[in-house]
Amino acid sequence: MSAKNPWFWLAAILAIALDRLTKVWVVAQLAPGESIALWPGVFHLTLVKNSGAAFSLFAGGSDWLKWISLLVSVGLCVYALVGPHLGSWEQMGFGLLLGGAVGNGFDRFAFGEVTDFLDFRLIQFPVFNGADIAINLGLACLLIGTLRSESRTPAPARPASKQIREPTDTTGG
């Protein structure tokens, strides 16, 4: 692990590992379209294959998405290696973004589609996966890092005020 931006690498490795492990497990347990109710009507594991982007946008004609995933992944690695030393929130944020991009990018290159399985039915949310969670957590970390750095930014210096001199006693007293 690089000594520079260590939280970046740790967050990326954990996100990639958790995404791969959960996808492999779900694919071994469920057939496409099959669902297991963990909390009936609220949260299910439902195996779906998504050839598009988030929420199945661009489904079917998304070959370019794998190249975007690769470009983003390479760009984030280069930034972590040759860019500035980042604060811990930024390191974790960019690392989680890398983990999500690699997780879904791997699926796109290996299978031509992304494995989704987390199904929140209570709010009718589109089915998603661990890489999607990593991307959203990464964005949240970057937002927190930005807000924290703004709150620590020192206020601009005030212009020097004119010195008021005390009157000197010229009466000798």
UniProtKB/Swiss-Prot annotation:
GO biological process, alphabetically ordered: proteolysis
Compositional bias (Basic and acidic residues): 163-173
Reactions catalysed: Release of signal peptides from bacterial membrane prolipoproteins. Hydrolyzes -Xaa-Yaa-Zaa-|-(S,diacylglyceryl)Cys-, in which Xaa is hydrophobic (preferably Leu), and Yaa (Ala or Ser) and Zaa (Gly or Ala) have small, neutral side chains
A Pfam family hit: Peptidase_A8
Keywords of this entry: Aspartyl protease, Cell inner membrane, Cell membrane, Hydrolase, Membrane, Protease, Transmembrane, Transmembrane helix
Transmembrane segments: 67-87, 92-112, 125-145
Cell membrane among keywords: yes
Top-level taxon: Bacteria
Pathway the protein contributes to: Protein modification; lipoprotein biosynthesis (signal peptide cleavage)
NCBIfam families given in the database record: lspA (TIGR00077)
HAMAP family cross-referenced by the UniProt entry: LspA (MF_00161)
Protein name: Lipoprotein signal peptidase
Source species of the chain: Gloeobacter violaceus (strain ATCC 29082 / PCC 7421)
GN (gene name): lspA
